[in-house]
């Protein structure tokens, strides 16, 4: 999930509604924070699986610390 958010995910309303239907209250709350920064890394425009693997291998969480700041206070 964090990887998708950092790459510029933009279906937060839909994901939040789905989390509510699945009774995932914590996830629903996190998706409703509206604090995620999409400019942290450029969007992935190349659907090549090998390029995605490289991104995942070198991936460092960026938005998760923001969530913990808001959610764990």
From Swiss-Prot:
InterPro entries xref list: ASFV_MGF360 (IPR002595)
Domain of life: Viruses
Family annotation (Pfam families): ASFV_360
Biological processes per GO annotation: taxis
Protein family according to the UniProt entry: Belongs to the asfivirus DP63R family.
Record-given protein name: Uncharacterized protein DP63R
């Amino acid at each position: 999930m964090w990887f998708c958010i950092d790459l510029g995910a933009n279906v937060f309303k839909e994901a939040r509604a789905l989390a509510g239907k699945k009774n995932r209250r914590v996830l629903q709350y996190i998706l409703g924070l509206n604090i995620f920064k999409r400019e942290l890394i450029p969007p992935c425009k190349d659907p090549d699986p090998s390029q995605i693997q490289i991104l995942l291998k070198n991936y460092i969480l960026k938005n998760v610390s923001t969530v913990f700041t808001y959610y764990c206070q």
